[in-house]
Regions:
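Class I SAM-dependent methyltransferase Rossmann-like catalytic core
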Residues: 1-38
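Class I S-adenosyl-L-methionine
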Residues: 5, 9-14, 166-204
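A generic alpha-to-beta junction signature in SAM-dependent methyltransferases
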Residues: 36, 63, 150-153
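Class I SAM-dependent methyltransferase SAM/SAH-binding core
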Residues: 43, 47-101, 106
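A short acidic, Gly/Pro-enriched loop at the edge of an enzyme's catalytic core
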Residues: 105-118
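A short SAM/SAH-binding and catalytic strip from SAM-dependent methyltransferases
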Residues: 116-138
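Short strand-turn motif at the edge of the Rossmann-like AdoMet-binding core
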Residues: 122, 156, 160-164
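A short glycine-rich, Lys/Arg-flanked "PGG" loop and its adjoining helix->strand segment in the class I
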Residues: 131-154
Length: 204
């Protein structure tokens, strides 16, 4: 995979919340039900520092003997206040997880096929992208969604923040002609977030 230009070196505050992995494990358990198989290949889109990777890993390992779990993040070189990048943090979180890889890359450069795809908080409006200082050319929600669908073999779980983003996401899904189920507000016994989140399950 081609390396991504290290265009983002901004520093921002905020330490990793270790409950993220437990939250992700919880919502995957509530909303996904993979069929047990010998091998599974899973993609996480927009992984950030991938602090929650253990939640995804533990969930999907229940359903297979051999798991390949890839994470892709276009803004992998953003710095924390401690001067460690997302990429460096992600390497720490995945170091003891077999079959897990983190790619500092653009989703559009990914060409492998995946049984399942997890996409938490995709950019469906330009404001978050601008807030993080990413070039405007990377705001292409329709193209990214359709490319993700091309990579998908079974199911994709998308989570959006707030009703407005969920409504936009639904329009993107309709425009792409994808088969999906709107899950409503995503519930979890682990309360980490102030704003409600909404989910979609896309199937092939």
């Amino acid at each position: 995979m081609a390396p991504v230009t290290k265009f983002s070196r901004k520093i921002y505050k905020g330490e990793v919340n270790n409950d993220e992995a437990a939250y992700v494990f919880d919502i995957l358990t509530r909303y996904m039900n993979p069929k047990p198989e010998g091998s599974l290949k899973v993609l996480d889109i927009g992984s950030k520092n991938w602090a929650y990777v253990k939640g995804e890993y533990d969930f999907f390992r229940k359903y297979c003997d051999n798991l390949t779990l890839d994470g892709v993040e276009i803004d992998a070189y953003r710095l924390y206040a401690n001067l460690y990048s997302r990429f460096e943090a992600a390497k720490f979180y995945i170091k003891n997880l077999d079959g897990v890889k983190y790619y500092a890359d653009d989703l559009m450069n990914i060409s492998d096929k995946y049984d399942y795809i997890i996409w938490l908080l995709p950019f469906v409006t330009p404001q978050p992208l601008e807030k993080w200082g990413l070039p405007k050319k990377y705001f292409m929600p329709q193209e990214l969604l359709e490319h993700a669908a091309e990579l998908l073999k079974k199911e994709m779980f998308i989570v959006n923040q707030g009703e407005q983003e969920a409504e936009i996401q639904q329009k993107l899904l309709d425009r792409a002609g994808l088969q999906y189920k709107f899950l409503g507000e995503v519930e979890s016994s682990i309360e980490l977030f102030k704003n409600p989140r909404y989910g979609f399950l896309i199937s092939k």
